[in-house]
A protein has these predicted regions:
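Short, intrinsically disordered, charge-balanced linker/junction segments flanking boundaries
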Residues: 1-4, 42, 52, 126, ...
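Extracellular beta-strand/beta-solenoid scaffold signature
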Residues: 5-16, 30-48, 60-70, 81-100, ...
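Extracellular distal adhesion/interaction modules in secreted or cell-surface proteins
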Residues: 6-14, 18, 36-39, 48-50, ...
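Repeated loop/turn-to-beta-strand initiation elements of outer-membrane beta-barrel proteins
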Residues: 19, 75-76, 103-104, 134-136
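A detector of tandem-repeat and repeat-rich interaction/domain scaffolds
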Residues: 139, 158-163, 184
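Polybasic, proline/glycine-rich intrinsically disordered low-complexity segments
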Residues: 175-230
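Extracellular/surface-exposed low-complexity segments
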Residues: 208-284
């Protein structure tokens, strides 16, 4: 419940003792310069740290990172709204995960530059992750970045990329030449925008590396499960019948996508006013 305006780092959590800490209901705005400027930076030990980062409204002005998390295990990033604009740095990131194990990234709303033809989005990414074993990136909405979701290196384990909506982007989903996210079977990601290059890109040059991140989709359930344009050396998306994941049915985001307004808790006086129990009957 803080309003934070900063020129370098809005909130820094640096090698804190592992706990179940929370960063919730904050408004954070960083107008800094340089490659290290971030709104929220969490540098963890490589052990379970269990941070819950939820319902924050984050604005990245002349900075690089909305949320930056290095190392740590089992951190959750939920229902955050992140605005990244403008891009004065060469690159900018909504959420950046570096070696974070078992991260949960759900129900976030990420919006970048709105002048793609002029800026080419620079090298911005809505969500970037590498070395994020057993990740769960589900039901996020990304728009107006160069890369909607960008993946680097190997992300082993049971990775889940589900129910994400790729809006207007230069490239929707981007995997580097050695990137691995595991098989994604009927996970219901939606390509619902204009893509100035490709909706989905895999830079791998061998079929074996591409198949370690292959997608099964059922376009009969929803035509938007099938990216409108794909760049890959081998078949990456296969259309076959199956039961598709949807965010609504799974009730992943009961508060909707992004930052939400909280109901004010009633105190005892509020409850008395509502009930009409103020004792006025004892006075003329």
């Amino acid at each position: 419940d803080n309003y934070i305006n900063a020129t370098d780092i809005g909130l820094l959590l640096n090698l804190c003792i592992p706990t179940t800490g929370e960063v919730t209901n904050n408004v954070i705005n960083v107008s800094g310069d340089g490659d290290a400027a971030s709104c929220l930076e969490i540098n963890d030990y490589p052990i379970p740290s269990l941070w819950n980062v939820e319902n924050n409204y984050i604005t990245v002005n002349d900075a690089r990172y909305g949320i930056l998390n290095r190392a740590g295990h089992q951190n959750a990033f939920m229902n955050n709204t992140i605005m990244v604009d403008p891009y004065t740095e060469d690159d900018a990131f909504g959420i950046y995960l570096d070696g974070t194990k078992s991260p949960l990234v759900t129900c976030n709303d990420l919006t970048g530059d709105i002048e793609p033809l002029e800026s080419n989005f620079h090298m911005s990414s809505g969500i970037y992750f590498e070395g994020a074993n057993n990740f769960d990136i589900t039901c996020n909405e990304v728009t107006d970045f160069r890369y909607g979701i960008r993946v680097s290196s190997q992300n082993t384990g049971e990775g889940l990329l589900r129910g994400n909506t790729f809006g207007d982007l230069w490239q929707g989903l981007f995997l580097g030449s050695t990137s691995i996210i595991g098989p994604q079977d009927h996970h219901g990601n939606i390509w619902d925008g204009t893509y100035y290059d490709f909706a989905a890109v895999h830079e791998g040059v061998t079929n074996s590396i591409i198949q370690k991140s292959r997608f099964l989709i059922d376009s009969g359930d929803n035509l938007l499960f099938d990216p409108s344009s794909i760049s890959a050396a081998y078949n990456w998306f296969t259309d076959e019948s199956g039961i598709s994941f949807t965010c609504d049915e799974e009730e992943i985001c009961p508060e909707g996508i992004g930052h939400y307004s909280q109901l004010v808790a009633w105190d005892s006086l509020d409850l008395d006013v509502i009930a009409g129990n103020l004792g006025f009957e004892y006075f003329d």
